[in-house]
């Protein structure tokens, strides 16, 4: 799905990422970990194309739908909570309009064997398939269900987003990202502004999410419950572990011990050769 090949990023004489390589496949659930400033958020921005590497390439399908929740964003909107959330369905609503138009045209045509008629049938079936994930629920119902899951009360749906704090506006943005049903989710500290109940709801949602996930979080339990692969960013390099966070901690400790033992053995060999 996404390949990061020989990627480096330097600025001001400092190398943040040094020739890193890794691949994100369909269904991968990756926890991106490392100290603050290691480059985790930058990797997400590089994948999105918000930032450009100094060298190397990121390969991804041109039609890949990426959902991205940054750690911080500005909010200057006067729409109601529900109206702002419903903007996530702009593409879906456009598809519904197109489906209605095709259905109307098919009803008026009688050239059933023509190429044009058959193409309309194919297009209608394609749109129907793309809309099938709604599972009988209207966009409004899905939006309301997601907002409730993220902690909003129904009586708050018609309040202006400008009357809510940045934390609550981030919940609205998260709802929109989830409702767009992307092929891959890139989430940067999504639990920062969530209470326990909302975190539990988000965990359950992500566990059932059929796409790929790249998650940055300081919540170890959340990482364990939502990911099965851990990519550590350390001093410009990455270390890829095919396990969740807790198992990664154990394997990382073993790796450090092995490196320490190898270094000590090398030092002993040097001392012997110089004796």
Where are these regions (language model features)?
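ABC ATP-binding cassette signature C-motif
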Residues: 1-265
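Short cytosolic helices in intracellular loops of multi-pass membrane proteins
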Residues: 267-275
């Amino acid at each position: 799905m996404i390949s990061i090949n020989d990627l480096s990023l330097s600025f001001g004489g400092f190398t943040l990422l040094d020739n890193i390589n890794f691949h994100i496949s369909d269904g991968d659930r990756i926890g991106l970990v490392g100290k603050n400033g290691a480059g985790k958020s930058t990797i997400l921005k590089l994948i999105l194309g918000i930032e450009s590497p100094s060298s190397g390439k990121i390969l991804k399908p041109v039609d890949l739908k990426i959902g991205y929740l940054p750690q911080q964003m500005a909010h200057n909107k006067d729409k109601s909570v529900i109206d702002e959330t419903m903007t996530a369905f702009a593409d879906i609503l456009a598809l519904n309009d197109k489906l209605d138009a095709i259905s109307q045209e098919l009803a008026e045509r009688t050239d059933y064997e023509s190429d044009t008629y058959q193409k309309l049938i194919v297009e209608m079936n394609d749109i129907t398939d793309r809309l099938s994930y709604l599972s009988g629920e209207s966009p409004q119902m899905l939006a309301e269900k997601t907002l409730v899951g993220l902690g909003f009360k129904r009586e708050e749906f018609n309040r202006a987003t400008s009357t809510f704090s940045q934390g609550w506006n981030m919940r609205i943005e998260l709802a929109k990202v989830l409702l767009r049903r992307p092929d891959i989710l890139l989430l940067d500290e999504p639990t920062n502004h969530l209470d326990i109940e909302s975190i539990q709801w988000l965990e359950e949602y992500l566990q059932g999410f059929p796409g790929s996930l790249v998650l940055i979080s300081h919540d170890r339990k959340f990482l364990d419950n939502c990911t099965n692969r851990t990519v550590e960013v350390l001093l410009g390099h990455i270390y890829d572990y095919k396990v969740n966070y807790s198992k990664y901690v154990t394997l990382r400790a073993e790796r450090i011990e092995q490196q320490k033992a190898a270094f000590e053995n090398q030092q002993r060999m040097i001392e012997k050769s110089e004796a």
